[in-house]
Swiss-Prot record:
One of its GO terms (biological process) is lipid catabolic process. Gene3D superfamilies: alpha/beta hydrolase. InterPro entries: AB_hydrolase_3 (IPR013094), AB_hydrolase_fold (IPR029058), GDXG_lipolytic_enzyme (IPR050300). One of its GO terms (molecular function) is hydrolase activity. Keywords: Hydrolase. The lineage of its organism: Eukaryota, Fungi, Dikarya, Ascomycota, Taphrinomycotina. This is AB hydrolase superfamily protein B1A11.02. Pfam families: Abhydrolase_3 (PF07859). Its EC number is 3.-.-.-. The keyword Hydrolase applies. It is an enzyme of class 3 (hydrolase).
Amino acid sequence: MAELEFTDEKFTKVDPELKEILKKHPAGTENITNIWQMRAMDEECRKQLAETILPLPDDVSVTDILIPTRDGTEIDGRVFTPVSVPADYRSLMVFYHSSGWCMRGVRDDDSLFKILTPKFGCVCVSVDYRLAPESKFPVAHNDAIDSFKWVASNIEKLGANPKRGFFLGGASAGGNFVSVLSHIARDEKIKPELTGLWHMVPTLIHPADLDEETMAQFRSYKETIHAPVITPKIMDIFFENYQPTPKSPLVNPLYYPTGHKDLPPSFFQCCGWDPLRDEGIAYEKALKAAGNETRLIVYEGVPHCFWVYYPMLSLRKKYFEDAIDGFTWLLSHVKKEDD
């Protein structure tokens, strides 16, 4: 494997605002030894997020739906619809939340949808999935595959026109689904075709599946031992609870066996103080090398999903501004049809 030249000292230089917060409120990640502790800490953090969730705009409706899966289970979905935009002019994005495949997070990105839906006339479908350790590999991936195919088959019923844009987005474990599903959609020739991908802090490798020489190139795993939110040790806890099949491309999409050619344009948002930083950057490089269009932003000195866990940071405003710019960029690649 060629040397990956993507480590920058600025990435892990702690954001000044965050440094002051951590002096008063230490992250506590070093004390996490099991998934139950992680879930408890996660719930406490989300109480802060709940106070910052934007109100629902007047021109956006929200509908809760149930999506069927292969084993007969129905999983939750929430549809954000721009009611003032005619259905024929609406694009659609399917979005998968962060979780480490183990933690609840389906409402984490509601504020994002409340911004994108009215601004861009985009129907946003936020999809849940079953979690480990209660449901082990490959249940979460199967839920993602089944829900994506269901949405693809029901876009018009969901009030959107795929010719205006059909997008996949996700954060962390949800970002993993974005990569996996885009390859499946390409290889299986799923219609309508995807027009854009949005990768937020994606998990794209299983360290245990890589040889030492390759793993050594992902320096972010060494540089984030004391990071807030997630550390390499916490990533180990997630994998131990989800128990993926060794070498599965579903958890190692960076090395997807059918390669990365002919994928839609990809927008990346990665965090500098995050174990997953380097795999996100490496994946962006791999997509670009395969001839795909990409755009990458790295937020220096902040941890994984900082906009969820540290919503008081002023950098969160930039995250939303970048999200708007990034989605505008994805929309710009959609082939225009006559109005």
